Amino acid sequence: MAIEDLFKIVKERFVAEQPAVPASQEGDVEIPQDLLFKCPRCGAVVYNREFTAAMKVCPKCSYHARLTWQERLELTADKDSFVELDAGMKSLNPIGFPKYEDKIAKMQQQCDMNDAIKTGVCTIRGYRTVIGIMDSHFFMASMGSVVGEKIARAFEYATEHNLPVVMFTASGGARMQEGIISLMQMAKTSGAVKRHSDAGGLYISVMTDPTTGGVTASFASLGDIILAE
């Protein structure tokens, strides 16, 4: 027997005796979503309770995860102080975009909101404030007729009652399913901000991930104070 054949026999026997690796152990380790969080930027793995306690900021690289409107409200407003404005406002599919109603209904169920923004009145450390929170989980918080109208009405309410406005922006831009109507919201919201400013009102704009497109080009960039998360 040649020496090469001997090594071949030993190799085949060794490979045959290796225990099979379960499919669940191949590749990346699956992380239970309710227990651990894996940072998409640096790959660090932390306990979810620690991640949540840190306002969903990675302790290793300071990556900011996107928050829901409920999480943002809980972090900002005094407990049980929030009263929603225009709670029943919903889109009527103004240009008849195919299956738009079905997509909206699905987002409403998933995100517990009628459209991509929640507006209302609350207190922040005791100070009465009009607040708006955009949620990127709802259609990437794109600005359509409902979002624009709710923002405009929030500023009008603040102007009428001499209140400051804090707006948390997060948007992928205009909502294509509503066509030109979505672009009109840029002028509408900017006009409402201007009237609030002319009346002496304070407006704080907090830009969060992602703030892009028509939202950036309109009310998000018009704050007396602009903060970027």
Model feature map: region roles:
Residues M1-I204, P210, L222:
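Terminal-region recognition feature
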Residues G223-E229:
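Gly/Pro- and small hydrophobic-enriched strand-loop and loop-to-helix capping segments
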Residues T208-S218:
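Gly/Ser-rich catalytic serine loop of serine hydrolases
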